[in-house]
């Protein structure tokens, strides 16, 4: 298992409103007002050695309505002294008075990753690493349909993954794992969402419920034929002034023949915090988590969270005894009072594991 040798730390952060919107009356937000926030970071792990990077968010309104959702572009990247690098850009653009939503994901990386096998009880292995080159491009376009706050539309997902060095990983060296040499996945599908949140950065009321189906096929240029079903349901309750209870159910199911790197991956900085992302993987991934958010002093806030989740090969193989806990706490710093945009640091714990996460925006 990956051991974190020195935690990610904040050196300094900068915030700008260099592109102020023109003065308007108090019930509108001017089109074109652009704000941004950026932060550098440094961390060390045995796999990466020293790594230096930066992240940030650019956010703006493309509508002149007061309650319109802000479009935003988040980005992060790092480079290590042993020549690994990772760059991710996530634009989310609201158009035509929020009636259209274009969200994309771009990622390019050459990094060490980990593979411990497939299943809920996959054991630790000595040589768990491999070196990969990865390119991801996901595009989702949704249009308002049937009623306000309900959107649906198409999805396209493309991924090219090359296993450049198996690093003696016995599971990949056996060539018995589907996708052990990498490959291309190309999928087309649709997505439907119902979003009643009162704020996309820090919801205090409402919910976000999303369902998607994506089909990957050789007819679309994919090396693998499979399908993916994803349900993400979040609810937000204001218990007291500025005290928020948020909870989420997350379910992913795959059919067909997905490669090992496209299986449902447990862990990471959003769901099941405390576990290395992908430490456990399979065709089914289900998780439930809750988080309590409250203010402390000035712009600082505090959260506690807990959850349960696991992976399985099929529904009949789900075992209560292998369900894994996730719990922890975090600190928030409000970088924009108007939009309720936070910088977050979370410390998560799992079963014999832990993780530290640093980002902009809430985990969910």
Indicate where each model-derived feature is located.
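Transmembrane beta-barrel architecture of outer membranes
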Residues: 49-53, 72, 84-88, 134-138, ...
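Short loop/turn motifs that connect adjacent beta-strands in outer-membrane beta-barrel proteins
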Residues: 22-34, 62-70, 96-101, 146-149, ...
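C-terminal outer-membrane beta-barrel translocator/porin domains of Gram-negative envelope proteins
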Residues: 188-193, 197-296, 305
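Gram-negative/organellar outer-membrane beta-barrel architecture
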Residues: 27-38, 43-184, 266, 281, ...
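Short glycine-rich beta-strand segments
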Residues: 107-111, 159-161, 212-218, 252-254, ...
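Bacterial Sec-dependent N-terminal signal peptides
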Residues: 1-23
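C-terminal hydrophobic structural anchor segments
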Residues: 293-326
């Amino acid at each position: 298992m990956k051991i974190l040798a020195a935690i990610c730390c904040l050196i300094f952060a900068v915030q700008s409103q260099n592109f102020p919107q023109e003065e308007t009356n108090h019930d509108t937000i001017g089109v074109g007002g652009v704000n941004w926030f950026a932060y550098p970071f440094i961390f060390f792990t045995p796999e990466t050695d020293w790594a230096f990077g930066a992240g940030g968010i650019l956010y703006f309104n493309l509508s002149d309505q007061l309650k319109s959702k802000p479009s935003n572009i988040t980005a992060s990247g790092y480079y290590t002294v042993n020549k690994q690098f990772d760059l991710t850009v996530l634009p989310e653009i609201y158009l035509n008075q929020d009636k259209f939503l274009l969200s994309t994901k771009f990622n390019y990386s050459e990094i060490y990753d980990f593979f411990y096998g497939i299943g809920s009880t996959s054991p630790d292995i000595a040589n768990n690493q491999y070196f990969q080159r990865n390119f991801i491009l996901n595009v989702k376009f949704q249009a308002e349909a049937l009623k306000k706050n309900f959107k649906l539309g198409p999805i396209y997902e493309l991924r090219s993954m090359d296993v450049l060095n198996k690093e003696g990983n016995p599971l990949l060296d056996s060539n018995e794992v589907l996708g052990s040499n990498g490959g291309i996945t190309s999928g087309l599908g649709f997505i439907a969402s119902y979003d009643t949140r009162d704020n996309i950065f820090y919801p205090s009321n409402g919910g976000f419920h999303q369902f998607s189906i994506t089909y990957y096929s050789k007819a679309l240029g994919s090396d693998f034929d499979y399908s993916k079903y994803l349900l993400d349901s979040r609810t937000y309750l204001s218990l007291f002034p500025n005290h928020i209870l948020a909870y989420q159910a997350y379910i992913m199911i795959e059919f067909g023949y997905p490669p090992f790197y496209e299986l449902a991956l447990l862990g990471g900085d959003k769901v099941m915090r405390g576990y290395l992302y992908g430490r456990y993987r399979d065709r089914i991934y289900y998780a439930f988590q809750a988080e309590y958010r409250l203010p402390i002093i000035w712009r600082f806030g505090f959260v506690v969270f807990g959850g349960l989740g696991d992976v399985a090969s099929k529904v009949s193989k789900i075992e209560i005894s292998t369900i894994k806990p996730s719990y922890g706490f975090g600190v928030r710093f409000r970088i924009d009072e108007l939009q309720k945009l936070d910088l977050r640091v979370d410390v998560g714990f799992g079963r014999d594991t832990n993780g530290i996460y640093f980002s902009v925006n809430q985990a969910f």
